[in-house]
Design a protein with these regions (language model features):
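Short alpha-helical transmembrane segments in multi-pass integral membrane proteins
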Residues: 1-19, 74-142, 184-238
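Helix-terminus/linker motif at the lipid-water interface of multi-pass membrane proteins
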Residues: 28-47, 117-124, 180-187, 241, ...
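Small-residue-rich hydrophobic transmembrane alpha-helices
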Residues: 46-107, 144-163, 269-291
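Hydrophobic transmembrane alpha-helices of multi-pass small-molecule transporters
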Residues: 58-61, 174-178, 204-208, 278-282
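Transmembrane alpha-helical core residues of multi-pass small-molecule transporters
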Residues: 53-56, 101, 169-174, 195-203, ...
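Residue-level signature of transmembrane alpha-helical cores of multipass secondary-active transporters
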Residues: 15-23, 57, 98, 137, ...
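Cytoplasmic helix-loop-helix junction between adjacent transmembrane helices
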Residues: 120-130, 134, 141-168
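Alpha-helical transmembrane segments of multi-pass membrane transporters/permeases
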Residues: 98, 153-179, 190-197, 287
Length: 291
């Protein structure tokens, strides 16, 4: 697969299918989470997941910031004859940025989950359910950021199929695990969180196999002027980051207003709408990421 000399339509179609498949399964298993928890806990469970929704916007946006920003520059440098050979410096800086951001996000979720979820719209009735869902997720929280970053770099390292396989494998486990943990094991909303946490670990492990494959050209190297390169990455990825963060801010505003004036039952109706809008947003992302 020659990105410089290959025909545009077949190349784009291959990357579009990979990106669209990843986006679709990510959205579908969020919808399944909502459906399973709603069946088990009723409106309170669906409302609790609506409160958690902005958490995903934040962690995914941080992953896209370094993933999209770094992988775009990675491809540009690889395609430039004058600058070929420096692309892995951007991969290294993106990986360092991902570690720093994940540590900050992880510390925030571990130490301040109660005030964060309260700010996102949880009241005293929804807070225990939201925290119960987040309990297993907190321990693997950085993996959600790394999965976004790795998927972006794998697509630009001529392995979009593995990026899709990683997301699909984690997503399929999540769907099956939801039913098993929530109903068969009678774990309720905690089981949905556990399935999501294990699914993210599976996705991460599958994508890591790229680094032992013959297709891999990604290397950790000593970067020159890392701060400058990190600034380039954040500037390039900022537009994608901002779209996701803006969606999260909008969700928080809706959550708070709905809880203030209408209550948890109304928020339970809004929860599935969030998932559908995320699905549409992910489909739009896939078109841009394929390009």
């Amino acid at each position: 697969m020659d990105l410089l000399k290959g025909k545009i339509k077949p190349l784009y179609a291959k990357y579009l299918l990979a990106a669209f498949g990843s986006a679709m399964i990510t959205s579908v298993y969020s919808i399944v989470d909502t459906a399973m928890v709603g069946q088990y806990h009723g409106p309170q469970g669906t409302a609790a997941l609506a409160v958690v929704a902005p958490v995903w916007n934040i962690i995914y946006s941080l992953g896209l910031l370094v993933g999209i920003g770094g992988s775009v520059i990675f491809s540009m440098k690889r395609g430039s004859e004058k600058e070929s050979g420096v692309e892995n410096q951007y991969f290294t800086v993106a990986a360092i940025g991902a570690v720093l951001l994940s540590v900050l996000a992880w510390a925030g979720v571990l130490c301040f989950d109660r005030p964060i979820l309260t700010f996102f719209g949880a009241d005293e009735a929804l807070l225990p359910l939201a925290r119960e869902y987040m309990r297993p997720i907190k321990y693997v929280f950085p993996l959600f950021l790394f999965n976004q970053m790795l998927a972006a770099f794998l697509r630009n390292d001529k392995n979009p199929g593995l990026a899709t396989l990683g997301v699909l494998s984690g997503g399929i486990f999540n769907v099956a695990g939801d039913y098993f943990f929530v109903f068969t094991c009678d774990m309720g909303i905690y089981g949905a969180g556990l399935a999501t946490a294990i699914g993210s670990g599976i996705s991460f492990l599958v994508m890591l196999t790229h680094f032992i494959s013959h297709k891999n050209t990604l290397r950790l190297v000593k970067p020159e002027r890392p701060v400058r390169k990190l600034r380039e990455i954040t500037v390039t990825g900022f537009s994608t980051f901002f779209i996701d963060v803006a969606m999260g801010i909008l969700t928080v505003l809706f959550n708070r207003q709905i809880m203030k004036y209408l209550g948890a039952d109304a928020l339970a109706i809004y929860g599935p709408i969030i998932q559908v809008s995320t699905f549409v947003q992910c489909c739009a992302y896939s078109v841009g990421q394929a390009a």
